[in-house]
Amino acid sequence: GCKNVIAVLSDSGMMGGRVSHEFMLLTAIGEDTLVLCDSCDFKANIEACASVVDNSALSATEPLTLVPTPGMATIEEVTGFLHKPHNATCKAVVYQRNEDDGYVIAFVRGDLEIHETKLRNAVGAELHPAIVTPESGIVAGFIGPMGLDTKKITVLFDRSLDGIGALVCGANKVDHHYTGFNIERDYGKVTYADVARAIPGGICPVCGKPTLRISNGIEVGNIFQLGEKYTRSMNMQYLDENGAL
């Protein structure tokens, strides 16, 4: 049989069900990205791995301040200009739903990236990279939570932002950002989603130690815990030993 095959937690995808596992052949040329913990037995496809961060050192608050950031439209430019760390910024990533082209904006900690499968699952729709038009009211390069039309735009906050007292974020105004942005104080109560990619050295969602590493694999099999997903949807019934439904 194959050596170096492991079972990893996976996304159920179109098959559905609440739990599924893939059997992965570990290899550097594998097309799937896997997250493994060196401190426990946790193993997952990156699309099914919860992203966990520690924001305890970032809890201090500051006054909300509108600051000019002329021509500074990227995280690197803004953090360099304002002398702020990447993990104290609120980065916006914009998508559109395939079904109606409605905009979806996901906010994530500036040193992390969005995982599209996790975002798709959180939104409950297929997505594609956005084409931002003037009519959308979205100011590319300076997008922030405050002032967005949430009747037209679906807004999500990744849980990597939870607990950060003072963030740098876009002001939805060309050449301007806010410093000291506090989500609960300046935006309101939100329900955080898990849509960020896990990273090497990240915190394991099972044992809590910062010992995650990234590997690659080739899928050689898959199992799904489907429960009654298909039997109920197809209205399947059976006769018992007495011939009754």
PLM ranges: what are they?
Residues 1-245:
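Extended, low-hydrophobicity, polar/charged segments
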